[in-house]
């Protein structure tokens, strides 16, 4: 009974209660992604690892999943999440680890790590820095590909 209740709670939180009896092969990419998140939530673990949890989702579902993840974290679950969307990272992460070629180039509080300089040196993309009016946090807006070889290093940000 405990496992069934955990599955029902997780399916409800992820908005997939109506999909519990649908074969996985019949689900869209976005539905499948939300079902996978529900499966993760049903485990009720103290640490949750997520790899691109908003892939295949439309903007409304992306935000609802990110809000759900924030609520999960607020309730005491540690969440480690891989995300490539800089706006999502800036808005939802407390701490960031930036990697390039499998190596950590920066880590720390989001406000310290998420800069146009970091994006330029890590992803070779020029950005403008904006301020999110709802959180007050800075976030980069990509504007062009930075063609020259990387000239600096971010090793000092660790």
Task: Give the location of each predicted region.
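Conserved ABC ATPase "signature" region
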Residues: 2-19, 44
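Conserved ABC ATPase signature
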Residues: 23-27
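Hydrophobic anchor residue at the start of the ABC signature
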Residues: 37-38
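Catalytic Walker B motif of ABC-type/P-loop ATPase nucleotide-binding domains
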Residues: 48-52
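Helical segment within the ABC ATPase nucleotide-binding domain
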Residues: 62-75
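ABC ATPase nucleotide-binding domains
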Residues: 120-158
């Amino acid at each position: 009974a405990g496992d069934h209740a955990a599955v029902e709670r997780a399916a409800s939180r992820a908005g997939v209660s109506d999909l519990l009896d649908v074969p996985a092969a019949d689900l869209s990419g976005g539905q499948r992604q939300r079902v996978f998140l529900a499966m993760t939530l049903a485990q009720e673990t103290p640490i949750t690892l997520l790899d691109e949890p908003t892939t295949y989702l439309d903007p409304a579902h992306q935000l609802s999943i990110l809000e759900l993840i924030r609520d999960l974290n607020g309730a005491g679950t540690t969440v480690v999440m891989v995300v490539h969307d800089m706006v999502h990272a800036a808005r939802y992460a407390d701490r960031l680890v930036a990697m390039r070629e499998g190596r950590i180039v920066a880590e720390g509080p989001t406000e310290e790590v998420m800069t146009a300089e970091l994006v330029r040196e890590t992803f070779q993309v020029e950005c403008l820095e904006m301020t999110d009016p709802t959180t007050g946090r800075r976030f980069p807006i990509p504007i062009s590909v930075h063609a020259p070889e990387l000239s600096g290093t971010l090793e000092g940000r660790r």
